[in-house]
């Protein structure tokens, strides 16, 4: 399945628009990891633990988006966007990744 951030696919013709599809992942992070990630940020390094977790969550969101498109009979998703949101409250720290795009049939 073709997945692209562009509104069209060069060399392909969109013959049917299905609907907007989403892939959503909410992932928690624990206090100890938050603490050490904060220290890493202060000294100017990169937080490998967070980067790895975000990469996995992004992959899951895109896979979910692709599965929704397949269920609709699409063979491509155009206009894909991936958004990241931090969710904090009640002593919990989480982040949400949402991938969205338009499921289409191309030939």
From Swiss-Prot:
SUPFAM superfamilies: YbjQ-like. It comes from the Bacteria. Gene3D superfamilies: Hypothetical protein apc22750. Chain B (3.30.110.70). It holds the Pfam family YbjQ_1. InterPro entries: UPF0145_dom_sf, UPF0145_YbjQ-like. Belongs to the UPF0145 family. This is UPF0145 protein PM1668. The lineage of its organism: Bacteria, Pseudomonadati, Pseudomonadota, Gammaproteobacteria, Pasteurellales.
């Amino acid at each position: 399945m073709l997945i692209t951030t562009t509104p069209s696919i060069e060399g392909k013709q969109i013959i049917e628009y299905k609907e907007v599809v989403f892939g959503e992942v909410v992932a928690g992070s624990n206090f100890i990891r938050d603490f050490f990630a904060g220290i890493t940020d202060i000294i100017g390094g990169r937080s490998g633990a967070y980067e790895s977790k975000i990469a996995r969550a992004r992959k899951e969101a895109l896979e979910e988006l692709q599965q929704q498109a397949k269920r609709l009979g699409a063979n491509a998703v155009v206009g894909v966007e991936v958004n990241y949101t931090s969710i904090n409250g009640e002593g919990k720290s989480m982040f949400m990744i949402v991938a969205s795009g338009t499921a289409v049939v191309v030939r």
